[in-house]
Amino acid sequence: MGIIPSRNLEEQRREKDGIVYFDRGVIEGKDGRKYQRYAIQTHFVQVGESQKDLVEKYVRPLYQEGDILSFGAKVMCMCVKSVKTRDEVKPGWWANHLWRFAGINHTGVGMHEPYKLQLVIDMVGLPRVLLAAVCSAVTKLFGVHGVFYKVCGKGVGGIDGFYTRSSFELYHQMALINPDNPDELCAKLYQDTGIPVVLMDANDLQRDQLGKSSTVPLTDEQIQDAMADNPSGQGDELTPFILIRPLN
């Protein structure tokens, strides 16, 4: 059985210099290395805010030499304005019909939403979306899921938003698209702050590492170990920054 993700708990809540964070405890990786994790709470980040300023405000007071920062992809999307609003997306005939056949899960609407499906069509083209839909329908008969996203490619699986059940009203009207230069963004943030950075798109189902600065002292597998229980939390917890502190 894998590690079960959990929400931040009140008994884990701490505060330092006005910064609220949650002590997510120690986790041991497959290689025996251990990591302390701190989930740092922020305000709801708006489009165009500075990622450097956010790190200096929320992360700097808790940072120790040797720590690694897991920076949430949704916040990075907001900072670099990698977003689309409903007004910018016009669902056509195919989007208005195909969305009914898409799946849905508790972390988001998947493609079960015409605006989101139209955004994918705009990104990768209708022929690829139709091919992906056919492949997905066939493979689902054999219990294979996720083929639609693999065939579409181009980071389609990282699109979030247009989700009317979100706790945040802004996400009802806006979609976030993972940036296509994650390594560069991490390198620039390290250059500006001196803190090694990993860009993570995490939820309770998976933890996708989008990029990292070259100064991160952990392997990709060790990063996955440190984030295995999704210490960022799920939904409305507003803890997109995770300080990973290697202990041995």
In which residue ranges do the predicted regions lie?
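N-terminal and secondary-structure boundary signal
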Residues: 2-248
